[in-house]
Amino acid sequence: MAFDPASLTFDANGLIPAVAQDHATGEVLMMAWMNAEAVARTVETGRVTYWSRSRQAFWVKGETSGHVQRLIELRIDCDRDCLLLLIEQEGPACHTNRRSCFYTALREGEERIILDPMV
């Protein structure tokens, strides 16, 4: 069956959450938003493209930083309202220069930084 981005369930703003996960390690790297066109561009090019809510523009991950995300597999959840992007990540995924945006853990009621910036 051919994939059609219009078959996904987008929110009132026309967006769907997309979680990026390292295809080899399973590490969750980041979450961002996509609209139907960003999904289509990602599938067509293999370069992950998000929708920047703050800039109201397409954001090709790594276009300016060089920290490219290559799509290995796109998975759709059971309600078709969330995407899992299995990717190959070049360099850090987070704008803080960390491998993952999920670098703060809650441990014993305290926030702890668990990932240092990559050098």
UniProtKB/Swiss-Prot annotation:
Reaction catalyzed: 1-(5-phospho-beta-D-ribosyl)-5'-AMP + H2O = 1-(5-phospho-beta-D-ribosyl)-5-[(5-phospho-beta-D-ribosylamino)methylideneamino]imidazole-4-carboxamide
Biochemical pathway: Amino-acid biosynthesis; L-histidine biosynthesis; L-histidine from 5-phospho-alpha-D-ribose 1-diphosphate: step 3/9
Recorded GO MF terms: magnesium ion binding; phosphoribosyl-AMP cyclohydrolase activity; zinc ion binding
UniProt xrefs under PANTHER family: HISTIDINE BIOSYNTHESIS BIFUNCTIONAL PROTEIN, HISTIDINE BIOSYNTHESIS BIFUNCTIONAL PROTEIN HIS7
Cofactor: binding details: Binds 1 Mg(2+) ion per subunit. Binds 1 zinc ion per subunit.
UniProt-annotated location(s): Cytoplasm
Name of the protein in question: Phosphoribosyl-AMP cyclohydrolase
BP terms from Gene Ontology: L-histidine biosynthetic process
Similarity comment text for this entry: Belongs to the PRA-CH family.
Domain of life: Bacteria
Keyword flag Zinc: yes
Any Gene Ontology CC annotation: cytoplasm
UniProt xrefs under NCBIfam families: PRK00051.1 (NF000768)
Cofactor requirement: Mg(2+); Zn(2+)
Function: Catalyzes the hydrolysis of the adenine ring of phosphoribosyl-AMP.
Keywords: Amino-acid biosynthesis, Cytoplasm, Histidine biosynthesis, Hydrolase, Magnesium, Metal-binding, Zinc
Enzyme Commission number(s) from the entry: 3.5.4.19
Gene: hisI
Subunit: Homodimer.
Sequence positions that bind Zn(2+): 78, 94, 101
